[in-house]
Amino acid sequence: MENRNTFSWVKEQITRSISVSIMIYVITRTSISNAYPIFAQQGYENPREATGRIVCANCHLASKPVDIEVPQAVLPDTVFEAVLRIPYDMQLKQVLANGKKGGLNVGAVLILPEGFELAPPDRISPELKEKIGNLAFQSYRPDKKNILVIGPVPGKKYSEIVFPILSPDPATKKDAHFLKYPIYVGGNRGRGQIYPDGSKSNNTVYNATSTGIVRKILRKEKGGYEISIVDASDGRQVIDIIPPGPELLVSEGESIKIDQPLTSNPNVGGFGQGDAEIVLQDPLRVQGLLFFFASVILAQVFLVLKKKQFEKVQLYEMNF
């Protein structure tokens, strides 16, 4: 009888442990996936809209600058650098998901021409690997190798992101041609203000959803506020929930209007996009150009020599 009770107790403890482990996994997995800006991939087939706007701007509402640097021209089947700079004040702190302050992270999307893709590891030189650091790039879609995403990564370490890119070879890829191509890039620093499902993050300003008087402000145990607003005309009460993070701007007894800010705007980051152009250069065209320059130089040399020879003949005839 005692053995049976012991077995039941052990079975109960194992079942409880498994349940707790599953709950922790689900919660952790959700928080991690929601922390990445690239989870917007699930909602957009292409990160660049027909208007030219990159969809990251739908969640990162503030506008900030970025800078993209690529070579003017590259040869086929060549590895080159695309350098993205995301400047911001390193002293700034952002509001984290738990309402505390922390450093800013950065993320980026690089939209290359068809045929261009991330360089394989065996084609990357040691010098370039050192510039890249520990960054792990991935394709926006398995069938869109020309669109690369990265982030979030610590902004203090990676405010400059180096992408190793492999140019296509028209001899093996029929879709590639020796032309001038556009390159588009988007980069953000800091967390977004809106999640892909349309809900607000705690990194944005919260406005009143009704006109009336602030009847009560309840500070929640884990941070944030519940603000009770009573409409003076009909007595209707509305409760606005403020998550931890933004600073409260109103007080009890204050009259407010609909859409009036209840909090400050804690966002210190933002998103920016830019573009550049790159030429996929034909090696035969380069060789032809070099041959032309060499021909011009040789022609100039022969012309000078011929002129000197003619002057000598003239001088000789004058002496006679």
UniProtKB/Swiss-Prot annotation:
One of its GO terms (molecular function) is heme binding. It is found in: Plastid, Chloroplast thylakoid membrane. The 4 large subunits of the cytochrome b6-f complex are cytochrome b6, subunit IV (17 kDa polypeptide, petD), cytochrome f and the Rieske protein, while the 4 small subunits are PetG, PetL, PetM and PetN. The complex functions as a dimer. Belongs to the cytochrome f family. Gene3D superfamilies: 2.40.50.100, Cytochrome f large domain, Single helix bin. This is Cytochrome f. InterPro entries: Cyt-f_TM, Cyt_f, Cyt_f_lg_dom, Cyt_f_lg_dom_sf, Rudment_hybrid_motif. Keywords: Chloroplast, Electron transport, Heme, Iron, Membrane, Metal-binding, Photosynthesis, Plastid, Signal, Thylakoid, Transmembrane, Transmembrane helix, Transport. GO terms for cellular component: chloroplast thylakoid membrane. It holds the Pfam family Apocytochr_F_N. It is a single-pass membrane protein. The chain crosses the membrane at residues 286-306.
